[in-house]
Amino acid sequence: MRNLKLFLCMILLLTGCSYKTLNEAVQHKWKEPVKILYIENKKQTVIFTDGPTDVQYVFSTFEKEHGRYKYSTDPEEGYTFDSEVGVPFLIRTINREKVGNIIWGALKTNIKVVRVNVVYTNKNNPDDQIEVQIPVKNNVFIGYPTSSFFDSETSLFQEWNLSAKAYDEDGNVVANINI
């Protein structure tokens, strides 16, 4: 019996606190109920909202090993957003260790958004542009530029302007943003 307890303790220590579903892993870290809106398995990133109010949109990473999920609130990013004019459109461009450059965001609209096109234009050379087309699910998105071109959000906006357009199923522009 003692050997069995020792074996179980070693398994727990080696695997850490892992869960059968990502929802269970995230919920374990949050007091409020969360609603997962988008899971990107290739680079193990996720976007969710903070429960019944869906006010705060949160982006983070997770780990999946042996069919089990681990989630840490470090380095979580959460934002609330609104707009006085047009469709509220959140777009964030960040760099994460082990993942690289990431573009993520959300739109608050009843219109089904299917794609976001993001264009970065170099401030010193306007002909130098990087365009990223990102599929949208549940009006949220996670995308990755094909090449790494910044180290931090601060350095990005010192060198690049950002513009983005969100499109519906018919190809109509639902929202746009220029930063």
What is each PLM-predicted segment?
Residues 78-103:
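Extracellular ectodomain segments of secreted/surface proteins
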Residues 54-59, 99-102, 128-129, 160:
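Short, surface-exposed coil-to-beta transition loops
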Residues 18-83, 159, 174-176:
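N-terminal export/targeting and maturation segments
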Residues 33-38, 90-95, 131:
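Short amphipathic beta-strand and strand-loop transition segments with alternating hydrophobic
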Residues 101, 106-107, 118-123:
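Long, terminal "pre-/pro-" and other extracytoplasmic accessory regions
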Residues 115-179:
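Ser/Thr-rich low-complexity repeats and stalk/linker segments
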Residues 1-15:
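Sec-dependent bacterial lipoprotein signal peptides
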Residues 108-114:
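Short proline/glycine-enriched turn/loop motifs at strand-loop junctions of beta-rich domains
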